[in-house]
């Protein structure tokens, strides 16, 4: 009986494993859809996960490091004590001359739980802030170098996309930005994460905060008031509960065209 079990176990080495080969001519939308569908039977994945997978595999443009910054921030926001493990186990990341670990260090003492963003939240906010776009499928195309006007793929677009995404993530994880945004949300009455029932609404609120902070369109105190009002109204009306990316895109377009104050 044991021999039979060992024979079957040994036979695993010669078993054919299902492999799906995708043509390089496929549109990125189709590849994204296949990625999400294949994984739908296990842990539910989304386009944010596909973006993370794509940047993690791109060492040429520093995508692998960007993935770590996003992943580590998300982890530390929930478990601050992870910082000590990170410092002792990922020396390569911690010794980066850019000093990324210093930008995450403040999280080791963070006890705030109102907004604990996941990886896809960070990607989405950074993308909306820097590109004034909302659909992550478009980000995937841009990371591949897609020129939306000529429909060609260009290296300079990949480089520009990574530069902007790095900047967007840096603004997201900035201690001052993050803490001031959380203060604004708490001042609006949302003092516990139990009261945060819409991740999409708070993601857009943070993107709006960063956009206004960068544009200097209004004063710092006015930024908080606008963000508070926008967040409360979006929650009460359920603005981002259905087809959030379409609603994001519409709002970002209007903000770009006429501003927020008007």
Predicted regions and their residues:
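A generic structural motif
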Residues: 44-59, 195
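Glycine- and hydrophobic-rich flexible loops that cap the catalytic core of alpha/beta enzyme folds
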Residues: 1-25, 29-32, 38-41, 45-48
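Active-site-proximal loop/hinge segments that shape catalytic or ion-binding/gating pockets
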Residues: 3, 10, 70-71, 81-84
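A cross-family structural signal marking well-folded subdomains
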Residues: 49-51, 89, 93-261
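Surface-exposed beta-strand edges and their flanking turn/coil or helix-capping segments
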Residues: 32-35, 60, 242
């Amino acid at each position: 009986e044991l021999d039979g079990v060992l024979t079957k176990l040994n036979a695993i080495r010669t078993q054919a494993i299902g492999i799906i080969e995708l043509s390089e001519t496929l549109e990125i939308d189709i590849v994204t859809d296949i990625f999400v569908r294949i994984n739908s039977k296990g842990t539910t994945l989304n386009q944010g996960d596909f973006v993370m997978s794509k940047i993690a595999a791109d060492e040429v443009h520093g995508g692998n490091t960007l993935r770590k910054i996003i992943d580590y921030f998300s982890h530390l926001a929930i478990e601050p004590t992870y910082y000590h493990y990170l410092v002792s186990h990922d020396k390569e990341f911690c010794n980066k001359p850019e000093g990324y670990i210093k930008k995450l260090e403040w999280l080791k003492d963070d006890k705030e739980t109102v907004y604990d963003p996941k990886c896809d939240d960070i990607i989405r906010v950074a993308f909306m802030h820097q590109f004034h776009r909302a659909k992550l499928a478009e980000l995937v195309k841009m990371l591949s170098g897609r020129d939306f006007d000529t429909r060609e793929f260009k290296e300079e677009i990949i480089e520009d996309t990574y530069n902007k995404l790095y900047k967007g993530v840096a603004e997201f994880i900035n201690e001052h930005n993050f803490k001031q945004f959380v203060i604004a949300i708490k001042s609006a009455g949302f003092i516990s994460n139990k009261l945060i029932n819409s991740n999409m609404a708070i993601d857009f609120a943070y993107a709006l905060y960063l956009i206004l902070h960068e544009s200097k369109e209004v004063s710092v105190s006015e930024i908080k008031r606008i963000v508070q009002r926008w967040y409360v109204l979006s929650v009460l009306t359920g603005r981002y509960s259905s087809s959030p990316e379409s609603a994001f895109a519409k709002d970002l377009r209007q903000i770009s065209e006429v501003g927020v104050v008007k």
